[in-house]
């Protein structure tokens, strides 16, 4: 998950460097950012659910090899169409691996601590994204934007043998049949309301999160913040989310997501609006970035645990995969809308005010969850 987090977020780190080298505006590279997100959506919709039939371990191993090699290849892209194509294929590999890593973690965790376990595991995704931001701040000026891609793909290849040796296959309860149409079961047995709410939450928060990771360095730069400080602010968002996940995960397990996560999303909304007022003030920008990390990255780590906890083993990869896929649709919309707003010269403060709306939508969905059925997993999981 560390390398996946690095890979999934790295376009936001290298877009300014690519734009300078190719002599284009950052907004013109929106299609390359969107391509990776579309690939992750396709992978989550169509590749990840295959694990419920063929096993999670095999699918994760294949997916990691795909995104590792294609990430390295992206460093040698010479044109926008080539960059878009490589990021699309890389995203498919990422989208296939991520839901199954979450599912494996959930299946080997006690039911009462499942949200905490998934949040802790997924925090390594945020560490990878934050590490990538720090690495990019140092590598891009010295070695160029391609060095960031090569280092990311190289790390994935180095870690692959460890996955091959240590990763277990998923737990399958005795006598539990594999569903022929697992997607249909997301809306059966009283799951319809929760499934819809989970999808709304994932859509809103990933729309927000990927808007920020794609355009935060650019928007902060437009306010007068230096390139290095802007990238480091993105790292603060990720590391704050890691710290928050270890606190919020146990609270979610104890009190339920509808009592904990709305407050986190409210913090995010206030800090997103606030960072638009920071101007070139670096300290205030970093404080706001920390609050944003709590309410977006930290909350998303817990969102993954909520989805994994709710769905039984036989459809867990499908449930988590489709929730992430719907979220990926939001993650495409966020950067695209951000690119449109930037290209039309909308005031930066206005952009951040618009960006404060999705966390409020996610908070509302969790509040509605209080009327939904219990989130406990199927009896076979306990």
Per-region residue spans from a language model:
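C-terminal membrane-cytosol helix-exit motif in multi-pass small-molecule transporters
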Residues: 154-173, 362-370
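Cytoplasmic helix-loop-helix junction between adjacent transmembrane helices
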Residues: 86-123
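Conserved MFS/SLC helix-loop-helix module at the cytosolic interface between two early adjacent transmembrane helices
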Residues: 42-80
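Helix-loop-helix hairpin linking two adjacent transmembrane segments in secondary transporters
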Residues: 121-165
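Extracytoplasmic gate region of multi-pass secondary transporters
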Residues: 11-12, 190-246
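Cytoplasmic membrane-interface "Motif A"-like loop-to-helix N-cap segments
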Residues: 53-63, 254-265
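Extracellular/periplasmic helix-loop-helix junction of adjacent transmembrane segments
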Residues: 12-42, 229
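Helix-breaking motifs and short loop linkers at transmembrane-helix boundaries and internal kinks
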Residues: 23, 55, 76-82, 110, ...
